[in-house]
């Protein structure tokens, strides 16, 4: 698959041949969905907590005598049915992470990239660099490229000026190639890869 390479200013900068093993697969939404669920589950903090009857502080004294009151028998004020009692089956601190094989994760990334390429949501630029970290200049460049909702992937090192200028633009994410992931690809309308990112991807899946 051949794709045109453009500059940030919108000028043509040649073309690039995309690997069919990475960008030419028939997209499978089920594999992509599995990876997205894995990512979202893994990043959940799991710090929710409610106190059970063994953890709340109430007196341990029997509420009232066993017989002769006409009421139901009760021994503890810590039980869930009373105000101030412990929560029954409440949330506990735990990990929400689920298992997903590494090969499935790698396959999901290739399917997400293929889906973007097939749907016309993939753009390749020669480099993502700015001389001065000016958000206004970058907004103008993005407007010329039609980027209002995009994930931009650079090489191993993201240009400091570019990252600084882009971080204040809504719906624009900038990541180094090490941070590329299925969820961020799916949630953004356009995927922008630099030539350095493209080379790193092909080396990764070689």
Swiss-Prot record:
Record key words, sorted: Ribonucleoprotein, Ribosomal protein, RNA-binding, rRNA-binding
Recorded GO MF terms: rRNA binding; structural constituent of ribosome
A single Gene Ontology CC term: ribosome
Keyword RNA-binding: yes
Species this protein is from: Rhodopseudomonas palustris (strain HaA2)
Pfam families cross-referenced by the UniProt entry: Ribosomal_L4
Protein name as annotated: Large ribosomal subunit protein uL4
InterPro entries: Ribosomal_uL4, Ribosomal_uL4-like, Ribosomal_uL4_dom_sf
Its biological purpose: One of the primary rRNA binding proteins, this protein initially binds near the 5'-end of the 23S rRNA. It is important during the early stages of 50S assembly. It makes multiple contacts with different domains of the 23S rRNA in the assembled 50S subunit and ribosome. Forms part of the polypeptide exit tunnel.
């Amino acid at each position: 698959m051949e794709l045109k390479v453009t500059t940030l200013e919108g000028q043509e900068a040649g073309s690039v041949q995309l690997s069919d093993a990475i960008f030419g697969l028939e997209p499978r939404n089920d594999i992509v969905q599995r990876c997205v669920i894995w990512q979202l589950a893994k990043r959940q903090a799991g710090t929710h907590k409610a106190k059970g009857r063994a953890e709340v502080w109430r007196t341990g004294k029997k509420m009232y005598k066993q017989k002769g009151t006409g009421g139901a028998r009760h021994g503890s004020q810590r039980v869930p049915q009373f105000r101030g009692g412990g929560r029954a089956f409440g949330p506990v601190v735990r990990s929400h992470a689920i298992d997903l094989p590494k090969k499935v994760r790698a396959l999901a990334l290739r399917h997400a990239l293929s889906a973007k390429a097939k749907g016309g949501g993939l753009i390749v630029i020669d480099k993502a660099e700015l001389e001065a970290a000016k958000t206004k200049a970058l907004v103008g460049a993005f407007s010329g490229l039609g980027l209002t909702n995009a994930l931009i992937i650079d090489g191993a090192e993201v240009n400091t000026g570019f990252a600084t200028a882009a971080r204040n633009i809504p719906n624009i994410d900038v990541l180094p190639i090490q941070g590329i992931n299925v969820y961020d690809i799916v949630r953004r309308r356009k995927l922008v890869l630099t030539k350095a990112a493209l080379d790193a991807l092909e080396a990764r899946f070689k």
